[in-house]
């Protein structure tokens, strides 16, 4: 917002909802505001790097502040990205929940406003990173006296905070990860940083039982319907191993991508799909099963046409 100067000083519209919405601040933020805080800081003072878990709208009433930000949201495409900006009156900075933030007063008696969605509690224990962390090496102004509270000086290191965050990743296993559907699921899951994804097929399926998973996604057995019906795919031994593994694997949630053929077991392919489906129903109370019709993937790698063309 522009500053309106006169002989008394200046006036500024600190923030306007319609402007902030235009620049990406979510509507929900304005419904959840609980408190406005003001800090007055001596030159050189660093407050941070805080991560209280709530959103903030930060504006400067007087002076200049160097603000540093680290995105600690596992699900964010900018996870672990660092941003630095010198903020003066007339600028508004929206900090999403999960983004660690800190500010250094570059001028004396700097005044900073915080509009927040959480109540202040001096005894609360929130995550924080020591602002002078050597790994981060943030570009604070260290040319003069630097003032940091004892609480902020005792904050965790950047690497220890990252380790804690990444230990919360959900562990997911994809059975059939080299198949047409499985490979796409595996590829997409790998693009999300909040997931730790392992892939299994007939070559390493036994290793699935060595760990516990938050979720197991099964896209097996092979979708080669024609070959299965004439005995050239999905042999009995492989299906027995798959069914046994499904029964024994430890998972909080089990997702099966099956075929509508499982509902009609008059041929071998339907029987195979039904066996796998029954194993899921019997051994995993928290399950989801998706019955899909015959699909044709990239280069016709699925379905009857592919089977006929590649005999």
Language-model segments: which ranges?
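Non-catalytic, conserved peripheral segments adjacent to functional cores
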Residues: 1-87, 107-109, 116-169
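Hydrophobic/small residue at the entry helix of a nucleotide-binding pocket
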Residues: 95, 148, 181
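Short beta-strand His + acidic residue motifs that chelate non-heme Fe in jelly-roll/DSBH
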Residues: 101-106
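N-terminal Rossmann NAD(P)H-binding glycine-rich loop of SDR-like oxidoreductase domains
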Residues: 170-195
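Short-chain dehydrogenase/reductase
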Residues: 175, 179, 232-236, 266-277, ...
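NAD(P)H-binding glycine-rich loop region in Rossmannoid oxidoreductase-like domains
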Residues: 204-248, 259-264
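Conserved Rossmann-fold NAD(P)-dependent oxidoreductase catalytic core, especially the SDR/UDP-sugar
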Residues: 241-271, 288-293
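NAD(P)-dependent short-chain dehydrogenase/reductase
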Residues: 270, 274, 278-311
């Amino acid at each position: 917002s522009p500053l309106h100067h006169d002989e008394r000083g200046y006036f500024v519209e600190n923030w306007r909802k319609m402007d902030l919405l235009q620049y990406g601040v979510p509507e929900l933020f304005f419904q959840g505001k609980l408190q406005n805080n003001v800090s007055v800081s001596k030159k050189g003072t660093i407050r941070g790097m805080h991560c209280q878990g709530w959103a903030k709208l930060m504006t400067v009433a007087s002076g200049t502040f160097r603000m540093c930000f680290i995105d600690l949201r596992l699900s964010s495409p900018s996870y672990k990205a660092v941003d630095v900006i010198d903020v003066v009156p007339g600028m508004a900075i929206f900090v999403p929940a999960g983004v660690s933030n800190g500010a250094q007063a570059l001028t004396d008696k700097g005044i900073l406003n915080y509009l927040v969605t959480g109540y202040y509690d001096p005894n609360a224990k929130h995550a924080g990173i020591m602002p002078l962390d050597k790994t981060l090496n943030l570009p604070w102004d260290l040319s003069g006296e630097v003032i940091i509270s004892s609480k902020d000086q005792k904050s965790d290191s950047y690497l220890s905070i990252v380790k804690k965050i990444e230990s919360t990743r959900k562990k997911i296993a994809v059975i059939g990860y080299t198949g047409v559907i499985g490979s796409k699921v595996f590829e997409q899951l790998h693009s999300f940083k909040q997931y730790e994804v392992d892939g299994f097929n007939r070559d390493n399926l036994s290793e699935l039982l060595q760990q516990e998973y938050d979720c197991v996604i099964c896209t097996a057995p092979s979708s080669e319907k024609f070959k299965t019906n004439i005995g050239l795919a999905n042999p009995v031994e492989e299906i027995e191993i798959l069914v046994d593994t499904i029964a024994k694997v430890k998972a909080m949630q089990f997702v099966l991508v099956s075929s509508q053929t499982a509902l009609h077991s008059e041929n071998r392919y339907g029987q195979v799909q039904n066996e796998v489906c029954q194993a899921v129903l019997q051994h995993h109370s928290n399950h989801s099963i998706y019955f899909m019709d015959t699909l044709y993937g990239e280069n016709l790698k699925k379905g009857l046409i592919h089977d006929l063309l590649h005999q």
